From Swiss-Prot:
InterPro entries: PdxA, PdxA_fam. GO terms for biological process: pyridoxal phosphate biosynthetic process; pyridoxine biosynthetic process. It comes from Xanthobacter autotrophicus (strain ATCC BAA-1158 / Py2). Keywords: Cobalt, Cytoplasm, Magnesium, Metal-binding, NAD, NADP, Oxidoreductase, Pyridoxine biosynthesis, Zinc. This is 4-hydroxythreonine-4-phosphate dehydrogenase. Its EC number is 1.1.1.262. NCBIfam families: pdxA (TIGR00557), PRK05312.1 (NF003699). It is found in: Cytoplasm. It is an enzyme of class 1 (oxidoreductase). GO terms for molecular function: 4-hydroxythreonine-4-phosphate dehydrogenase activity; cobalt ion binding; magnesium ion binding; NAD binding; zinc ion binding.
Amino acid sequence: MVAPAPLVLSLGDPAGIGPDITLTAWAQRRELGLPAFLVAGDPEALKARVRQLGLTVPLAETGPEDAAGHFAEALPVMPAGPASTALPGAPDASSAPCVVASLEAALGLVQAGRAAALVTNPLAKSVMYAGGFPFPGHTEFLAARAARPGRPAPHPVMMIWSEQLAVVPATIHLPYADVPGHLTIDLLVETGRIVAGDMARRFGLAHPRLVFCGLNPHAGEEGTLGTEDEAIVRPAVEALKREGIDARGPLPADTLFHPQARAGYDVAVGMYHDQVLIPAKTLAFHDGVNVTLGLPFIRTSPDHGTAFDIAGTGRANPSSLVAALRLARRLADAEARLAAREGHRAASVA
């Protein structure tokens, strides 16, 4: 039986905790039952962090085809990009080429089918911008790389997932004052379609149940506390219903996240970042996973940043990375099973 392709992990900012959590996750691979993964990036940066953290983590420089064979005894690393001179906790714009090279190499493996899914370690936007990175973040970079001539560009959707709660913010990194101007019926409909489609295909939910938070307190109280919920959110929900998607809303966000309410839906779509990320991180601060929906490949990430202040100290918690690795493997396996079934059906029809 052929072993499944491994996951591939980008290094993230070498001055942050990406190397720390990667190494500590691998060190706990047996007790955690982690799926095999390969790191794309600078081996010397990892070796330096091994020494600083006092860990026993041998590295094996290899490619994805041999990663699973090495994984039990050594952390597989595929060298990629320039060497990093960054020190833990000392962000430096000169690290940007190292970060991009790691990400490009990891993505290339996934797009070539040599890795099953992409897991990205955290980067610092300020460092990347100072180094000339032209994208707002990981997600936009990946969407641009996934674009194909003659086809619409992918519409990436950020979902924060845990066993307790899955949420999607319709708008992400915007000042709150700018949110109403960015909300449109088309945006919410497209977001709902992508969420429903990926929850069905990759998460195995036959009929995903979506709820849409109201923008305003009490979901606007029928227009008395703002007009956006009746003018934008409700028409979007009705449009999704006409397409056969199980959608409800707008609903008051303040009563959507207690256990009884959560039992009634699969994904909550919020109108702005903190509306849904506060409950998500309250319920699963260490175990949340950032999943990018709407891309032609699987991408997960720990739901935290670079944490420069604790990089290299041994205090970084790898739990979110562990959850991201496990979810990436689960989604990749589900997609492989679905592709196999579709292939069998196509063959039987032919």
